[in-house]
Swiss-Prot record:
Location(s) in or outside the cell: Cell membrane; Cytoplasm
Membrane side Cytoplasmic: residue ranges: 1-284
UniProt function note: Vesicle trafficking protein that functions in the secretory pathway.
Cited Pfam families: SNARE, Syntaxin
Name used for this protein in its record: Syntaxin-111
Membrane-protein topology: Single-pass type IV membrane protein
GO molecular function: SNAP receptor activity; SNARE binding
Entry keyword set: Cell membrane, Cytoplasm, Membrane, Protein transport, Transmembrane, Transmembrane helix, Transport
Gene that produces this protein: SYP111
């Protein structure tokens, strides 16, 4: 499977270089060779592939910024700084969502174009090198997108896990007690940090700690907003992940077809060798039969001819 993908990407690079060379060298009234015609058919496909790659690169950059923002947020305590950071994070996530939807639309359009090429183009029938190249590249793009999905999912899980640890530390700082899991879950799920922590502070006779409580509330709002956006992004990726598996199965089928074709060719070569051996054997027995026939003729005709001469 990996070899097939590697060969397909090599074909992509080679075909694209050849296509650009043909386009630069070709002019009015100049007929391009057959390979150039094939590359011309792939020109739009290559351009679409590059556009998807650029969108993915932008998403990777946004992911790096989100990871950096998550680390930066650990050292921030002022509400204004936390809100500013939350604004940057939300802007990046909104941009990623927009790009992810655009990528999904582009990949769906590529799927439709691939299907149309199989129906309408004789050189792009199912299983042909051109069709395998288009299918493999489209599936490879989805595989990259799936890897990005896993990275964003890991970020979401890390943000919520770190937020949970922050709530636990702040609760311990205020009350001097390690909170039970149920208390932490209530603070996280219901967003009742101010009410719960104020009650805990009053119970233990500690002073006003509204700044800390407000910080936890701000972190809760930020974590919830980020989680909601990342879940929405995850759903977009998840919709495409189903197609990734389908494309993977198609590539496995293509690889099996290629292996089957190789087996058929090898089997055909064996049959040809057997046919040649059978032909040589038939000729040998034919020669032996002719020799035996000649000997029989000599053994029968010569005595008869001799007896006629004597009589």
């Amino acid at each position: 499977m990996n070899d097939l993908m590697t060969k397909s990407f090599m074909s992509y690079v080679d075909l694209k270089k050849a296509a650009m060379k043909d386009l630069e060298a070709g002019g009015d009234g100049v007929e391009l060779p057959e390979v150039g015609v094939t590359d011309e058919r792939l020109k739009g496909f290559f351009q679409e592939t590059e556009a998807v790659e650029e969108e993915m690169a932008a998403i990777r950059d946004a992911l790096a910024r989100l990871n950096a923002a998550n680390e930066e947020g650990k050292s921030l305590h002022q509400p204004d700084a936390l809100r500013a950071l939350r604004g940057r994070v939300n802007a990046d996530i909104i941009a990623v969502l927009r790009r992810a939807r655009d990528i999904r639309a582009r990949l769906e359009a590529m799927d439709r174009a691939n299907a149309a090429q199989r129906r309408l183009s004789a050189g792009c029938r199912e299983g042909t090198p051109l069709d395998r190249t288009r299918t493999a590249l489209t599936a490879a793009l989805r595989k990259k997108l799936k890897d990005l999905m896993l990275d964003f999912q890991a970020l979401r899980q890390r943000i919520m896990s770190e937020y949970k640890d922050t709530v636990e530390r702040r609760y311990y700082t205020l009350t001097g007690e390690v909170p039970e899991e149920e208390v932490i879950e209530r603070i996280i799920s219901e967003g009742r940090s101010e009410e719960l922590l104020c009650a805990a502070v009053a119970e233990h006779g500690k002073g006003a700690v509204l700044a800390t409580v407000h910080e936890i509330q701000d972190r809760h709002d930020a974590a919830r907003e980020v989680e909601r956006s990342l879940l929405e992004l995850h759903q977009v990726f998840l919709d495409m992940a189903v197609v990734v598996e389908s494309q993977g199965e198609q590539l496995d089928d293509i690889e099996r077809h290629v292996n089957s074709a190789t087996t058929y060719v090898q089997g055909g070569n064996k049959e040809l060798r057997k046919a040649r051996e059978h032909q040589r054997s038939s000729r040998k027995w034919l020669c032996i039969g002719i020799i035996i026939l000649l000997l029989l003729v000599l053994l029968v005709i010569v005595p008869i001819a001799t007896s006629f001469k004597r009589s």
